[in-house]
């Protein structure tokens, strides 16, 4: 076995300690994206107007739920469509933006045909322009990844948008550890569209958007960035004990 271990999350450290690993040999490194670029963009983008970012919605000022990532089966986006369909059953209360391409795109568009026709659902396709992705994320009110959530969580929180995903950590990616329930997002019961629907409604009704934006930035600025990762690596190679 290695002398030291770099781990993506605190949960991994807890599990390894339970299996007999020495805590001082386990360094939580977290994960990161292009933090410095995102930090510059976030200040520029949060002053935008929703009508300029979401011209494709009939009412762009409604709360916007976003998913960004590959449209694959493991993401279980059918659950998100079911939940938002239920929320909008009698009147349109929420917009849904899906950004990304993938094998499930045609199936999802077929499932969401009514939402597309009624102007509350939009498929933006794959987008590799980080400023455009930042516009979508920054002006959305909630990011939902109903299957597992990986770097999508870090991407969304980096632009001040809270994250929702399922609650079964045995079926999750490490980055789900960035979500602090009630602070910068929440969890719903795995594979339960009804619970997802209720949790989305409750969150959007009670959320203080500007406070949640600050909460979302906070965890990224503290841990999920290359500057913090460098301090962890330096502690490891110099023989210092882990911070976490």
Feature names for model-found ranges:
Residues 1-52:
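Donor nucleotide-sugar binding/catalytic pocket of nucleotide-sugar-dependent glycosyltransferases
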Residues 53-75, 81-84:
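Conserved donor-binding/catalytic core segment of Leloir-type glycosyltransferases
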Residues 65, 80-84, 96, 196, ...:
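A structural motif in glycosyltransferase catalytic domains
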Residues 99, 106-127:
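Nucleotide-activated donor-binding/catalytic signature segment of Leloir-type glycosyltransferases, i.e.
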Residues 126, 166, 181-193, 201-207:
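Conserved acidic donor-binding segment of nucleotide-sugar-dependent glycosyltransferases
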Residues 135-148, 161-162:
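Acidic donor-binding loop of glycosyltransferase active sites
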Residues 162-171:
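Short hydrophobic beta-strand element within catalytic cores of glycosyltransferases
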Residues 195, 202, 208-223:
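A short, well-ordered alpha-helix in the C-terminal region of glycosyltransferases
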